[in-house]
Amino acid sequence: KASVGFKAGVKDYRLTYYTPDYETKDTDILAAFRVTPQPGVPAEEAGAAVAAESSTGTWTTVWTDGLTSLDRYKGRCYHIEAVIGEENQYICYVAYPLDLFEEGSVTNMFTSIVGNVFGFKALRALRLEDLRIPPAYSKTFQGPPHGIQVERDKLNKYGRPLLGCTIKPKLGLSAKNYGRAVYECLRGGLDFTKDDENVNSQPFMRWRDRFVFCAEALYKAQAETGEIKGHYLNATAGTCEEMMKRAVFARELGAPIVMHDYLTGGFTANTSLAHYCRDNGLLLHIHRAMHAVIDRQKNHGMHFRVLAKGLRMSGGDHIHAGTVVGKLEGEREITLGFVDLLRDDFIEKDRSRGIFFTQDWVSMPGVIPVASGGIHVWHMPALTEIFGDDSVLQFGGGTLGHPWGNAPGAVANRVALEACVQARNEGRDLAREGNEIIREAAKWSPELA
C-alpha cells in the first residue's frame, strides 16, 4: 500500500484525504460544503478533492511532501451525506487543523477555505454552507469593536429595536441638502440615519463636506430631542489610508458611528477599521454590498451565514441581514439562524435553520442585525416580532416617501414602533393583530394615518 504514495502521475485524492473514521478535534475548523461533482466523479473523490485543494494537496505527489507531516497538516473529508431531493449533490464535511491558518486573519482563513478549490474541474459546483470556528481560533480575533450591550449604553436606548433610515436619493444631493435630510429624520424620531453604501466621495458631494453637514444635523437634532443620535458616516474609500483618514475625521467631529462596505472593501481593511473604532470609541456599521454575488446561487458560492461569521470575527457592530418581509431575498428560518449566529453567544446545531455546527463564541461581543430594504410601517409588527429588541430597522423610502415629508415620515415610524413594542409588552400577538395595532396608533398620530 505504501507504494501508492510515490508513484508518479495523477492519483486519487481519496486515498489520502477521505478519512471517514477521523474524530474531529475541538481545535479543528470544520466546514460543510455542498458539492456537485461532475458526472462520473464519485462523491468520496469530490469531497477528498475539496479537502486537499483547500489545504495541503496538489494534483500529484511531490517529493517535498516527505519534508513535512501531511497527517498533521492536511484537511480531511470526514463525512459525506447525500442531499435529499437533489440528484448527485452531497454535503461534504471537512476538518482543517488549526495550524493551517494565521491568527486573527479572516482574509487568510477565506483564502484557504474558499480559494482555488472553487475553480476545480472535477466539481460542477461548490458551495460553502457553514463553518465551525473553534474558540482556539476565534479568541485570536477582537471581534466587534463594542457589541450590543456597550452600544445600548452609549446610546442610552433600551427595550426596543433601534430605527434607521438610508438617505435617498442615494446619489446626487449636495452636502448641505443631504445634511438637511439627516436633520429632519433624526428630529422626527429616528435613532440613526445612514449614508448609502455607494456614497463615498463623489464630485457632487465630497466626503469632508458631507461629514461636516451631517455632524451639524446630528448635534442640532440631539439638542432638540434630548436623545443621542447617530449618522453612519461611510468611511469606505479606494485605499486603506484614505479610509482611516475619514474615520479619524469622523471621530474629530464627535460622530458616534462610522460605516464600511466590508465585502467590497475587503476583510483586511475591515479589521483595521474595527481596531481603530474600538480604540477610539466609534461604533461600526457594516454594509454587505456584493454579498448576493457570493451567496445567491443555491449550489455555488458561499452562504451568507459564513460571511456573517467572518464579519463577527473581523469586527462590526451592525450588519445588514435581510428583512424576511421587504423587497430583497431572505427566508425566515434561515435568516433567523444567522441572526442568532450574529447576536448570541452559543448557538446549537439546527439543520432546519441551516446551522450545520454548534458554534460557541466564548463571549465575543455580538453584532446587531439590520433589517433594511423595501420595508415600511405596515411591516413594523412583523419586524418587531421576527427580529426582537436587538436589531436596527431601517426604512429608507419608508421614511422619506411620506407624503408630508421626511420628519413626518420619521414620526410615523417611531409611533408605529413604540405602539408595537407596547402591544408586545402587554402580551398581544403581533403576528395576528399587527395591522390593528398600527390602525389604533394612527388614530392619535396624523403622521401615521
Swiss-Prot record:
Biological process terms in GO annotation: photorespiration; reductive pentose-phosphate cycle
MF terms (GO), sorted A to Z: magnesium ion binding; monooxygenase activity; ribulose-bisphosphate carboxylase activity
Cofactor: Mg(2+)
Main location: plastid
Subcellular location: Plastid, Chloroplast
Organism: Liriope muscari
The protein's name in its UniProt record: Ribulose bisphosphate carboxylase large chain
Keywords on record: Calvin cycle, Carbon dioxide fixation, Chloroplast, Disulfide bond, Lyase, Magnesium, Metal-binding, Methylation, Monooxygenase, Oxidoreductase, Photorespiration, Photosynthesis, Plastid
GO (cellular component) term, any one: chloroplast
